[in-house]
């Protein structure tokens, strides 16, 4: 958004400090949303393309199918989000994609006991950060960061600042 600056009437080449800082904030926002998008599009594949997940011989073929489907879906959504961020200049939908991705994790975790799901497989290994399951810790942190970025995006959109 452009903010009209009266000083430009006297000096057309003059640019206010607010106008200079806006592109910096917008670029920061786009880079931050990009980092999170790459996180949810790439990190699950790195974490799950091994013998504890997708190549786990104890998983049924159908479970492995769903695992591969999830990884392809996450990567595809991330590619669309990157297109929206850098070509369409839109961060709102990519932020929504990230929040939906995280919501899927939390729904699966909360309802896990009803369908026999668990955060860690018996033949897997549990990683913790500060005493919390590493996924819970990381997804909580990313969720808070996404909400902060959403607030920043709304501020820039409404005020141009």
Task: Kindly give the residue locations of the regions a language model identified.
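Membrane-interface capping segments at transmembrane-helix boundaries
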Residues: 152-161
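Cytosolic juxtamembrane helix and N-cap/initiation of the first transmembrane helix
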Residues: 6-38
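Hydrophobic cores of alpha-helical transmembrane segments in multi-pass inner/ER membrane proteins
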Residues: 72-80, 139-151
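Juxtamembrane helix-break-helix junctions at the cytosolic face
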Residues: 79-94
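Core segments of alpha-helical transmembrane spans in multipass integral membrane proteins
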Residues: 42-44, 62-82, 103
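Membrane-interface interhelical loops and short amphipathic "cap" helices
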Residues: 49-63, 117-128
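Individual transmembrane alpha-helices with interfacial aromatic-anchor signatures
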Residues: 126-143
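Alpha-helical transmembrane segments of multi-pass membrane proteins
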Residues: 39-51
